[in-house]
Amino acid sequence: MPDLLHDTQNVYHLFPIIVSEGKRDALHNYLEQNGVGTVCHYPIAPHKQECYANAEWNTPLLNLPITERLADEELSLPIGPSISFEDASIVVKLLNSFF
């Protein structure tokens, strides 16, 4: 976690990680089976979502490979200001046991 400045509190609400090699969904399922909820915030790359299908900028030539890779690999962990040290430790142990 990033260091905090003196007399401040964090407002972190997302802790995204990149899970490569096609393991994101397996990790998501593993964590869920062990009581840890996770979220894929953009499982479909924004430019491929139906709401942008007719956007002027969204042409067949649009090529956003990094965005598409992140849509396939991003997983947000439940780490924020309300999580206890003990709960964060459980998440870390589960991550270590998965990998």
What are these regions (language model features)?
Residues M1-F99:
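PLP-dependent aminotransferase class I/II
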